[in-house]
Curated annotation (Swiss-Prot):
Stated family: Belongs to the GatB/GatE family. GatB subfamily.
Organism field: Rickettsia felis (strain ATCC VR-1525 / URRWXCal2) (Rickettsia azadi)
Highest taxon of the lineage: Bacteria
Oligomeric form and interacting partners: Heterotrimer of A, B and C subunits.
GO biological process: glutaminyl-tRNAGln biosynthesis via transamidation; translation
Organismal lineage: Bacteria, Pseudomonadati, Pseudomonadota, Alphaproteobacteria, Rickettsiales
Protein name: Aspartyl/glutamyl-tRNA(Asn/Gln) amidotransferase subunit B
NCBIfam families, per the entry: gatB, PRK05477.1-2, PRK05477.1-4, PRK05477.1-5
Enzyme class: ligase
Reactions it catalyzes: L-glutamyl-tRNA(Gln) + L-glutamine + ATP + H2O = L-glutaminyl-tRNA(Gln) + L-glutamate + ADP + phosphate + H(+); L-aspartyl-tRNA(Asn) + L-glutamine + ATP + H2O = L-asparaginyl-tRNA(Asn) + L-glutamate + ADP + phosphate + 2 H(+)
The protein's role, per its UniProt record: Allows the formation of correctly charged Asn-tRNA(Asn) or Gln-tRNA(Gln) through the transamidation of misacylated Asp-tRNA(Asn) or Glu-tRNA(Gln) in organisms which lack either or both of asparaginyl-tRNA or glutaminyl-tRNA synthetases. The reaction takes place in the presence of glutamine and ATP through an activated phospho-Asp-tRNA(Asn) or phospho-Glu-tRNA(Gln).
Assigned keywords, A-Z: ATP-binding, Ligase, Nucleotide-binding, Protein biosynthesis
């Protein structure tokens, strides 16, 4: 467990998260308006989104399905009966004067997610609920020195709010939870998880206490927009609370904003209670009733999820848990890996994938979907190494050409004359030449200077243009020098 070091001793982090995940859907939660990112202001607004009198919401079935699939991925209970409520508050970018949400009867409850801890163990984080709600619009204050403007393109977009219990005990655990949740949502296809575009936002509820004491007063940090900022915001806020408590001051329950530039949290408003929002069932929407048949159908059509893939890669492919997690962390990489792994040695493939390919992708600042090397050609390269057609050193040269051109490795090897020399007679001839040309080094080796062995290997490789089979060279050289 991580602690905050105060002037009077150690304090514990108590953290709960609320994740707002924008549902991957072409239309909004209660209207047919488009959800395309970065469209011209107010170009994707229906009469329902603008709250024109007499306009009634119509529930988007696809958004409901996405929420159910996400709940199944979280190993949660899917409630067969749920209700939409009105959350009443006034803000300029909320034209209805209320937000349609689910307070009393959410669609999903009681889920779990396991995350790795600093000790290497797995820790279970309980999911209190997942509920559906609509997003608000956006206030724009930088268009004019005299006026603020409202863009309602986001108003009515479907969100899944995923709320954890206060089971998180450090900033790093919070970051791990968000990363793992984001990956799960991407695999399911219910949210793209792009925090830079605002399609996934995190609120953190933070309090501190001494070990064994009751829970303290919490503060909520709103709209944290990156994994790095989650860590920084929690660290700052926890330290702020510890400083206040150690100076004999009380923590005020409030909502705060994190400033990424200063690394500090600032008061936004006093924290509201549920009573302040006057929740009541929305009279324009019927209760949502979900059948067992629908739940079973959606469950049967779920893709293979990250934890399932990790288990498969370790058991079927023999990968280490660490390597499996690295590959599964990106769905596109996992898909690429599986296509190639069906044609070659998975372990050797993993080594080349995580070192050479990842290195070149990072250098070129591109994703694996933009890579010119097909999974099939990558597998061919691994097989050429595996069957001793080329050495690992030559393979790196071949790989670089493949990355630039997309050519098949066997064609490159043929064109460049890079086939590994594994003929004993040819290699013995070269070795005899090297020994004859270096009598002093031979004498030195025979007197016990074992490090000279590497010199002889290097000379043989030099004479063969790096194409000699290194394993065979070592064996033949040793036989001759030790005789």
């Amino acid at each position: 467990m991580a602690y905050i070091e105060g002037n009077t001793g150690k304090w514990e982090y108590i953290i709960g998260l609320e994740i707002h995940a924008q549902i991957s859907s072409k239309s909004k939660l209660f209207s047919g308006s488009s959800t395309i990112f970065a469209a011209n202001p107010n170009s994707q607004v229906s009469y329902v989104d603008a709250a024109m009198p007499g306009m009634l919401p119509v529930l988007n079935k696809h958004c409901v399905y996405q929420a159910i699939k996400t709940g199944l991925g979280l190993k949660a209970k899917i409630n067969k009966y749920s209700v939409f409520d009105r959350k009443n508050y006034f803000y300029a970018d909320l034209p209805q004067g209320y937000q349609i949400s689910q307070f009393y009867y959410p669609i999903v409850q009681n889920g779990t997610m396991e995350i790795p801890t600093s000790t290497g163990d797995l820790k279970t984080i309980r999911i209190n609920r997942l509920h559906l709600e609509q997003d608000a619009g956006k206030s724009m204050h930088d268009q004019s020195p005299h006026y603020s403007f409202i863009d309602l393109n986001r108003a009515g977009i479907g969100l899944m709010e995923i709320v954890t219990e206060p089971d998180i005990s450090s900033p790093d655990e919070a970051a791990e939870f968000v990363k793992k949740l984001r990956n799960l949502l991407r695999y399911i296809g219910s949210c793209d998880g792009d925090m830079e575009k605002g399609s996934m936002r995190c609120d953190a509820n933070i309090s501190v206490r001494r070990s064994g004491e009751p829970l303290g007063t919490r503060c909520e940090i709103k709209n944290i927009n990156s994994i790095r900022n989650i860590i920084k915001a929690i660290e700052f806020e926890a330290k702020r609370q510890v400083d206040l408590l150690e100076n004999g001051e009380a923590i005020i329950q409030e909502t705060r904003l994190f400033n990424a530039d200063s690394g500090e949290t600032k008061t936004m408003r006093l924290k509201e209670e549920a009573l302040d929002y006057r929740y009541f069932p929305d009279p324009d929407l019927l209760p949502l009733v979900i059948s067992d048949e629908l739940i079973n159908e959606l469950k049967a059509n779920l893709p293979e999820l990250p934890d399932q893939k990790i288990e498969k890669y370790t058991k079927e492919f023999g990968l280490s848990k660490y390597d499996a997690e690295v590959i599964v962390a990106d769905e596109s990489v996992a898909e690429y890996f599986e296509k190639a792994a069906n044609e070659c040695n998975p372990k050797m493939l993993t080594n080349w994938l995580t070192s050479e390919l990842f290195g070149q992708l990072n250098k070129a600042s591109i994703g694996i979907n933009e890579c010119k090397i097909t999974p099939s050609n990558f597998a061919k390269l691994v097989k050429l190494i595996e069957n001793d057609t080329i050495s690992g050193k030559i393979a790196k040269t071949v790989f670089e050409i493949m990355f630039e051109t997309g050519k098949a490795p066997d064609k490159i090897v043929e064109e460049k004359g890079l086939v590994q020399v594994s003929d004993n007679n040819v290699l013995n001839t070269v070795i005899d030449e090297v020994i004859a040309e270096n009598p002093e080094s031979v004498e030195g080796y025979k007197r016990g200077k074992d490090k000279l062995f590497g010199f002889f290997v290097g000379q043989v490789m030099k004479k063969t243009g790096g194409k000699a089979n290194p394993t065979l060279v070592n064996q033949l050289l040793k036989d001759k020098l030790d005789s």
